[in-house]
């Protein structure tokens, strides 16, 4: 069994999603990319136990905060990174530290996302 941590990436922007997947996989993480919260995720039938979820705030069906709350119902230990081009100008995110572990403004650098992920979930040495 591969000890690499699993990361869920949900972003409806294909370029951002693919860039995140590429960056995280090269860093040694296993990644499940999603465009939106799928029916299986909504029902709590997650294909993996995720250590971290990187969620865009603006999604087609629900906002990232609602996705984070649903995810935490089924995987309470999953750490949440909320990304948005509107940070820090989203007043609805104020006081959400119980749900969201880190906030990261778009655009972000490769080093910035890797630093945040490593703080929440380091890749084990091979």
Language-model regions, residue ranges each:
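Acidic, metal-coordinating helix/loop segments flanking the phosphotransfer/catalytic sites
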Residues: 33-52
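Active-site residues of response regulator receiver
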Residues: 56, 84
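A Lys-centered signature of the CheY-like receiver
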Residues: 106
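Two-component/phosphorelay signaling modules centered on CheY-like receiver
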Residues: 14-32
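Short amphipathic alpha-helix used as the core "switch/output" element in two-component signaling
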Residues: 65-76
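Acidic catalytic/metal-coordinating carboxylates
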Residues: 36, 63-66
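Alpha4 helix (beta4-alpha4-beta5 surface) of REC/receiver domains from two-component response regulators
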Residues: 66, 87-103, 111, 115
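Non-catalytic signal-transmission and effector/linker regions of two-component phosphorelay proteins
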Residues: 1-8, 14, 18, 49, ...
């Amino acid at each position: 069994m591969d000890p690499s941590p699993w990361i869920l990436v949900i972003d409806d922007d294909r370029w951002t999603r693919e860039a995140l997947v590429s960056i995280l996989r090269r860093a040694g993480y296993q990644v499940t990319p999603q465009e939106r919260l799928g029916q299986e995720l909504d029902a709590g039938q997650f294909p993996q136990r995720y250590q971290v979820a990187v969620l865009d705030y603006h999604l087609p069906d629900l906002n990232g905060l609602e996705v984070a709350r649903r995810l935490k119902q089924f995987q309470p230990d999953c750490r949440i990174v909320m990304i948005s081009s509107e940070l820090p100008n989203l007043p609805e995110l104020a006081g959400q530290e119980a749900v969201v572990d880190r906030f990261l403004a778009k655009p972000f650098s490769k080093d910035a996302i890797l630093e945040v992920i490593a703080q929440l979930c380091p890749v084990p040495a091979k």
